[in-house]
Amino acid sequence: MGSLFRSESMCLAQLFLQSGTAYECLSALGEKGLVQFRDLNQNVSSFQRKFVGEVKRCEELERILVYLVQEITRADIPLPEGEASPPAPPLKHVLEMQEQLQKLEVELREVTKNKEKLRKNLLELVEYTHMLRVTKTFLKRNVEFEPTYEEFPALENDSLLDYSCMQRLGAKLGFVSGLIQQGRVEAFERMLWRACKGYTIVTYAELDECLEDPETGEVIKWYVFLISFWGEQIGHKVKKICDCYHCHIYPYPNTAEERREIQEGLNTRIQDLYTVLHKTEDYLRQVLCKAAESVCSRVVQVRKMKAIYHMLNMCSFDVTNKCLIAEVWCPEVDLPGLRRALEEGSRESGATIPSFMNTIPTKETPPTLIRTNKFTEGFQNIVDAYGVGSYREVNPALFTIITFPFLFAVMFGDFGHGFVMFLFALLLVLNENHPRLSQSQEILRMFFDGRYILLLMGLFSVYTGLIYNDCFSKSVNLFGSGWNVSAMYSSSHSPEEQRKMVLWNDSTIRHSRTLQLDPNIPGVFRGPYPFGIDPIWNLATNRLTFLNSFKMKMSVILGIFHMTFGVVLGIFNHLHFRKKFNVYLVSVPEILFMLCIFGYLIFMIIYKWLAYSAETSREAPSILIEFINMFLFPTSKTHGLYPGQAHVQRVLVALTVLAVPVLFLGKPLFLLWLHNGRNCFGMSRSGYTLVRKDSEEEVSLLGNQDIEEGNSRMEEGCREVTCEEFNFGEILMTQAIHSIEYCLGCISNTASYLRLWALSLAHAQLSDVLWAMLMRVGLRVDTTYGVLLLLPVMAFFAVLTIFILLVMEGLSAFLHAIRLHWVEFQNKFYVGAGTKFVPFSFSLLSSKFSNDDSIA
């Protein structure tokens, strides 16, 4: 893995690919994932590029594979994983693969079409059989037909008129029979009555079982109906109404003999159709099983082939159209691998003239490549979310690995909560190879991707929880308190000592609401707690006052150290980019401004802690007053922290005042002087011009020494401000904005770090309230039923702890930690104006199809 401190050194390379070997060379490059292609045909439409026909062929193959996957999934056939990453298919096998897939598609569509046709015929025959069975007794029955709706007039006692009677009336009696869905029966009957004006008689009955609709495949409830009518015009109306309501009409036999013959024929045909349908389904499943063996590999191969042609469309042809020219960004350490990939592709294609590459100088800014692993990837993503780092500048992710979980833990510090978070993250880490976790839903996937961040956040929270001595809002007495309560009783001291000190007696114990421990009394304070805060503070009424003072000062100290470290990292950027004047004219004034004010504030805090004990604490001056007096220069003499304090503060204020104009005007004036002189600091040595060679002939004229020199100076050329681009007004305005932003930002950013204190206080108080409202109530029950009450109380306490204190409070602390890194820390040195290096790599392809077919 490359360095995480700074991005990889990149170079621009020109590839010369023979037409017959270009496909194989790009296939080898895609497997290695070493280079990022530049589009040399930006002014050419995607429909006018050289290999658009091949891309269309790949899209057609993708369409066929999508159809195959859909049919295999519909048949509930498992898709075997097969080879994880098969190579791109050779060109000589592409046409064969296309013919096989097209032939398989035609066969599947034909078999599927025949199967659906057989299935539809079978369902129609089954419906016809049910219709004959139900309507068999309609003409033999003589029951009273009761209308469903009041607007229907009552019928005669006989539901159907006698056929002989109709013959005597001279009318022609007709029948229409079929099936209709249950939900359409009432509307269907109403429409028949209104349209036919009562010249129809409808008889219907519900089927005992649900049948599948041949059109939709939905299993629904059906009704069998028989419509008797007289007159040809009425018959036409009835048939049209049946079509409107999507009724399934079947011929109605006129005689019992005809009914019996139809029934026998239907039974025979149904048995034959069952046999043919089963054989068709077996054959279709065999074809799909055979296709499923290679469909996953085919998907990957087609995606790789399409990606290769996308990259070939970015290349340009030379004047002879026999050679493709490509420009790629490649890390310098991967140049040998790039050459080997070209040799491998040329060897596989059997070309007599191998493909080759040359590095070319450029003034363009290369993309940023920072190699990560599964541990550092999450922290790098946090930095990249703010902005991808500029080329070769210091990468904050290296330090974020420690500072981010630590600042989170300062706000979240609780031993119990941190340990629960650590266990959850440890569970994700130990099961990181589980396929269900890596393919889970979005929220769980987000936790899984940040498992190492959660692990360190939980681990650091355990550490800060031990310092705060907080475990679910309660203190843990591991080493014994450093305070001795018994030493405060008067009985433990001599009468002479009792006259000099305020001690406790029985009356004091009975009548005082609060008792104060005096560390000046011998034996009361035996020394500091070995690690963290003494557990006796958990019982003190002034506990919150003490913790607020401690956490506020700690937040200021951590914030100033964090920001100063960011300014120091900026020095590494200036030295790397050969801009030493920025060190003296920008970084040094910034450090002086920061340390002379806020560094001195840290000094006063630590000095007061060390110089004043419990005996002299009443004489200790206020740091706030002393810090304000530092800028007011009071005439009256005050008792300072140390001798000579006023002189030291005057010197620090003078340095601060002098640093501001240097920061404001130093860099613009120096660049103006440099622009007018042109002979200072080696400008004559750097005044060369980097020219890109646009053809193979020009590249061949370059000597190896020139190419090496161009590569080594590419970084300087990318950032060099030429004489033609110099604009003093713009530089002055930019530096003025930077100076004002920095000076005001030092104050606002220092105040912003007080969120460490605020969120730590909020988390501790919320945890304390949750304990007091739930666990304290459950633990105070002394009856026999106390255990039974404690179980639901503990369960409710655990649920609220997880969702409120771990999830909600953890998310809040997480966002505030991100803010402190993005704004307060990274703006001191991090530009974040680069572009990410996205290599042409087959590992970035997915085996699943999506609407976006381009290579990410």
From Swiss-Prot:
Keywords: Cell membrane, Endosome, Hydrogen ion transport, Ion transport, Membrane, Phosphoprotein, Transmembrane, Transmembrane helix, Transport. The chain crosses the membrane at residues 394-412, 415-431, 446-475, 550-569, 588-608, 652-671, 740-764, 786-824. Subunit of the V0 complex of vacuolar(H+)-ATPase (V-ATPase), a multisubunit enzyme composed of a peripheral complex (V1) that hydrolyzes ATP and a membrane integral complex (V0) that translocates protons. V-ATPase is responsible for acidifying and maintaining the pH of intracellular compartments and in some cell types, is targeted to the plasma membrane, where it is responsible for acidifying the extracellular environment. Essential component of the endosomal pH-sensing machinery. It comes from Mus musculus. PANTHER family: V-TYPE PROTON ATPASE 116 KDA SUBUNIT A 2 (PTHR11629:SF22), VACUOLAR PROTON ATPASES (PTHR11629). InterPro entries: V-ATPase_116kDa_su, V-type_ATPase_116kDa_su_euka. It is a multi-pass membrane protein. This is V-type proton ATPase 116 kDa subunit a 2. GO terms for cellular component: acrosomal vesicle; endosome membrane; focal adhesion; perinuclear region of cytoplasm; plasma membrane; proton-transporting V-type ATPase complex; proton-transporting V-type ATPase, V0 domain; vacuolar proton-transporting V-type ATPase, V0 domain. One of its GO terms (molecular function) is proton-transporting ATPase activity, rotational mechanism. The modification Phosphoserine is found at S695, S700. Relatively high expression in kidney and liver. Lower levels in the spleen, testis, and skeletal muscle. Also expressed in the thymus. The gene is Atp6v0a2. It is found in: Cell membrane; Endosome membrane.
